[in-house]
Every structure is written in C-alpha cells, then in structure tokens.
A protein has these predicted regions:
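Conserved FAD-binding subdomain of flavin-dependent enzymes
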Residues: 54
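Ser/Thr/Asn(+Pro)-rich, low-complexity disordered segments
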Residues: 49-51
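Membrane helical hairpin/interfacial module
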Residues: 58-59, 63-82
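A contiguous, low-structure linker/loop signature
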Residues: 78-118
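Active-site loop segments of alpha/beta catalytic cores
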Residues: 1-38, 42-47, 57, 68-72, ...
C-alpha cells in the first residue's frame, strides 16, 4: 500500500506539539531497546552492550515504521542495582528482553550503612550510556537521559520484595535508600548537563515500582510522591525543561495525587500503561502531551487486525487530548513483536491519525 505523504519532519511535528499546535499527523514513538536490534538481525543483548549498533538499529527501524525519534528512547543511564555494585548479566535466551539482575548490593540493613553514592563517571554501565548520548548529539537528536524514579531506583538497590517489607516494618530504611538514589540520579545528570548543556537534554523517568499492582495510593503519597517533588525541584535548578514521564503499569489510583502536585513544566510528555484509559489521562493532565498506549501483549501475541483495531481506538481517544497525543505501546515494545504488527500500527496511523 502507499502511505500518505508527511507534511512535516519529525522535528517539526514534535516542535508543533511542544508549542501547543496540531502537527500534520499523530507522531509514532516507541519505548524499545530489543526490538530494533532483532529487527536488523542482531541480539537483544546488542542493545545493552554496543551503543553504535543499537543506535543504527533504532535509526533504520524508525525509518522503516515511520517513528518519530524526537526524543529517542535508549537504555537506562542510571541503574539502581548495577550502579551500586550489584551483579548482572546480559540477556541470553530469546525470552529475556533486558539486563538480568543476579544479585542486589543491599541484602541487609547493615549493607545500607556501607552504601556509597557511586562516581557518576565510572559506576555501572554509565560509560556505554555516555557513548550513546554522544551519538544522539552527533546526529542532531535530543540527548535522552533515562532513569527510574527515586522510589524505583531505591527498590532496585535492595530488590522490590525487600523494599516492600521495609515500607511496612522499617520505613526509615526506605527513606535512606531513596535519598541515596536521588543523589545518584542527579550526580549523573549533572555530568550529562556539564557535557551536553541543559538545553540539549530530554529527561526521561519511569516509575514501574509505583504501580498500584505493587503499592497502594496511600503508600505512593507517603513514600514516592515527596521524591517526585524533590526530583523536579532539582531538575528545574539544572535548567532542564523537557521532561518525559512513563507512568508505568496500573497507576489509576495515583493519578489524582500526581495531577494535584503539579510537578513538571507544561507541556511534558506523559506516557501511560495500557491499564489507564487515555481519555481519563487527558482529563487529569490537560496541559501535557498524552503518550500511549496499545497493549504490548497484544502487539506481541495478537493478530495484525487486532493490533490495527486497538491502535485505531487509541488514536480516536488520543485525538481528543487537548494538548496533543503521541501513539505508542503501553510500555516497552516487546522484542519478539512480529514486524507485521508494527506495520499494522503504522497503517492505522496512516488511516486515522491525520489532522485535517
């Protein structure tokens, strides 16, 4: 089939959204590391271990499927367990889609006493992340700084199961870990800002451990929300103005508190799991760009027609968002997604995603 001719470049399309103007069509963007690598005949591990190959795989895959890489997602810069000395390995079998944690740096209360904020230039896999950021800068893309929320980074340091127990029995330990996580995130972000300048950086945060599948809204407000407030105070002090937030999983019960706190500059890019209705998301955040949220399981396991139909529904809802919409999956695009289902997404945007 022949697709309609774009009337804007990706840069023009995203610039329009961030200036509260309608673009020619709904942009497509994906949170993904493994899929582009598999798409060009490489392993998922390549996405985490070879910045040049990953970058080229993403560029070619984006062109193939009409994705808009303003901004481009990339592997995490800050990793809670790995950065603090935890064990890990690269994904090996076809069903492993990310780094695999083999041990946590904090196993007991006493381990927290010995925990030190890492050197931002040397810890974990930060060197590889810097290589990728320099490739983004070289090719005229925003430099995407990817971290999880302080709550999620802290949970990654000791493991979510242990962190959840401490929330109930020793909440002061969780507070200590979150303060350490916050300092580490911003030490590394300062390194990025010193290297590229605040105007070039697009700060991305995900918050998977804050899902209501894990914690209650009361726990969210007590433990996680204060660190979102502090995060944005520090982000503002660095002069970073572009923010992308993946509110991962089922966080329907957290949305009122997030909306009420009014934390980030507007418009920001707010991504939602498939569990959140896009029209409801737009009601909570009318001044931000809504991003999402075709169910990833259906993209991997469903038929092209099912994916096409779900994408159409997302487009119809997203078009109603007062400050704009970006079409994506509801979380990371599964590495084993059939290529034809990505074509189905592009076809649905071509058929229904234009602003006339």
């Amino acid at each position: 089939m022949r697709f309609k001719q774009d009337r804007m470049s990706s840069q023009e399309r995203m610039d329009a959204l961030f200036n509260y103007r309608k673009p020619d069509r709904i942009p497509i963007n994906m949170i993904t590391v493994g899929f582009p690598c598999r798409n060009v005949g490489q392993t998922v591990a390549t996405g985490y271990d070879d910045p040049e190959k990953y970058f080229q795989a993403m560029i070619w895959t984006a062109e193939q499927y009409g994705w808009d890489l303003i901004p481009e997602i990339c592997p995490h810069v800050v990793l809670g367990s790995v950065d603090f000395g935890g064990g890990f390995r690269l994904p090996e079998c076809e069903f492993e889609g990310a780094l695999v944690i083999t041990s946590f740096p904090v196993k007991t209360e006493g381990d927290i006493d010995n925990l030190r904020v890492p050197d931002p230039k040397k810890s974990g896999r930060i060197g590889k992340a810097m290589e990728l950021s320099k490739l983004q800068e070289k090719h005229g893309l925003p430099v995407t700084f990817v971290s999880r929320s302080p709550f999620s980074v802290a949970a990654n340091i000791c493991g979510l199961e242990q962190f959840s127990k401490w929330m109930l029995k020793k909440p002061e330990l969780c507070e200590r870990l979150m303060m350490i996580a916050m300092d580490h995130i911003f030490n590394v972000l300062q390194y990025w800002t010193d290297t590229f300048g605040a105007d070039q950086i697009f700060a991305f945060m995900s918050s998977p451990c804050e899902s209501n599948q894990v914690i209650s809204p009361r726990q969210f407000e007590k433990f996680a929300l204060p660190y979102h407030v502090e995060y944005h105070k520090r982000l503002k002090s660095l002069g970073i103005k572009r923010f992308w937030f993946h509110i991962c999983g089922d966080q329907n019960l957290n949305l009122p508190a997030l909306a009420g706190a009014s934390l980030w500059p507007h418009p920001s890019l707010l991504s939602f799991g498939h569990e959140v209705d896009l029209e409801e998301a737009a009601k909570f955040f009318p001044h931000d760009i809504i991003y999402g949220n075709v169910e990833p399981t259906v993209i991997q396991m469903g038929t092209p027609q099912q994916v096409y139909d779900l994408t159409k529904i997302a487009i119809e809802k997203g078009k109603k968002a007062p400050s704009g919409f970006v079409l994506s999956a509801g979380c990371e695009l599964p590495p084993l997604s059939p290529p034809v289902n990505l074509f189905a997404i592009a076809k649905a945007v071509n058929d229904f995603g234009w602003y006339e």
